[in-house]
Design a protein with these regions (language model features):
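Hydrophobic core positions within HEAT/HEAT-like alpha-solenoid repeats
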Residues: 48, 86, 153, 175, ...
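Short sequence/structural elements of tandem HEAT/ARM alpha-solenoid repeats
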Residues: 65, 103-107, 207, 215, ...
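Generic helix N-cap/helix-start motif at coil->alpha-helix transitions
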Residues: 44-47, 129-133, 164-171, 184-185, ...
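Alpha-solenoid HEAT/Armadillo-like helical repeat scaffolds in large eukaryotic proteins
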Residues: 73, 155-162, 189-197, 208, ...
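Extended amphipathic alpha-helical repeat scaffolds
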Residues: 1-186
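Alpha-solenoid HEAT/Armadillo repeat architecture
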Residues: 52, 56, 75, 94, ...
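Short alpha-helical interface elements
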Residues: 75, 95, 110, 114-118, ...
Length: 250
């Protein structure tokens, strides 16, 4: 009797997994072929649970297809579809464990940056995605991964500096991200690398400092006054010019 029960339970798990995969693949196909799928509130509310089960059953490939098709919909011409895709994606990411969450955000960061470039509306999901990118940028800075930090900061810097024209609401979100990252701790860490080249990342540290704009300008000017080496002064002046500020009399 025990063996029969165990066999029935095993069969039940197999049946559930088969059904889960079938439903998930159908959902993935619908997301790919019909963007209006995103407007089905009941279905979208169940999406994080579906992803949770896919993770539990180690169905990474199927989960990847769903998230990839969601990201594709971030680039729809329909603003409502983009908003729903962003919400569905952030609902999924927020349901993950911290480690898996970071992993997914880093893997999607390139496409999320592209979306930030084209998006025209600030929604709660838009702010959430910006916060995701801020967090991975901070994580990169903490681990001295300055090369990886630059493309993440670049989009926020482009909006903050006006190089990429956006409405006031988007500009404020991006400006806040820059302010949040331009902490005294980060600036000190970056200036240390810029001044010493201890980790052979002086140029990258300089680029990041220039993206912080006028927040780091005073520190740059102080460094310029203190530094007597001609080549170093030229490097710092180039860094100051890189902030996009008006010419300053030296």
């Amino acid at each position: 009797e025990g063996t029969a029960q165990s066999s029935a339970e095993s069969q039940g798990k197999i049946d559930f997994k088969t059904k889960l995969i079938r439903v998930s693949e159908k959902l993935s196909l619908n997301l790919k072929e019909n963007e209006n799928t995103l407007l089905d509130k009941q279905l979208m509310s169940a999406l994080p649970k579906i992803i949770e089960q896919l993770i539990a059953h180690k169905e990474q490939e199927t989960m990847g297809k769903i998230t990839s098709n969601l990201v594709d919909n971030l680039f729809s011409e329909n603003a409502e579809v983009r908003a729903h895709a962003a919400k569905a994606l952030t609902d999924i990411i927020n349901s993950l464990s911290p480690e898996r969450k970071t992993e997914m955000i880093e893997s999607l960061s390139g496409r999320l940056i592209e979306w930030i470039k084209i998006e025209t509306s600030v929604t709660p999901a838009y702010k959430t995605v910006c916060n995701y990118l801020q967090n991975i940028a901070q994580n990169f800075i903490n681990h001295l991964h300055y090369t990886e930090t630059i493309p993440v900061l670049d989009i926020f810097n482009d909006v903050n500096s006006g190089k990429l024209e956006k409405n006031d609401a988007i500009h404020e979100v991006c400006a806040q991200i820059i302010r949040n990252l331009a902490t005294e701790e980060n600036i000190t860490l970056l200036f240390k690398e810029f001044n010493t080249n201890e980790h052979d990342k002086k140029d990258e540290a300089g680029i990041i400092l220039s993206m912080f704009g006028d927040i780091t300008l005073k520190r740059m000017l102080d460094t310029l006054q203190e530094n007597v080496d001609g080549n170093e002064r030229v490097r710092i002046m180039h860094l100051i010019i890189g902030t996009g500020q008006r010419a300053i009399p030296f």
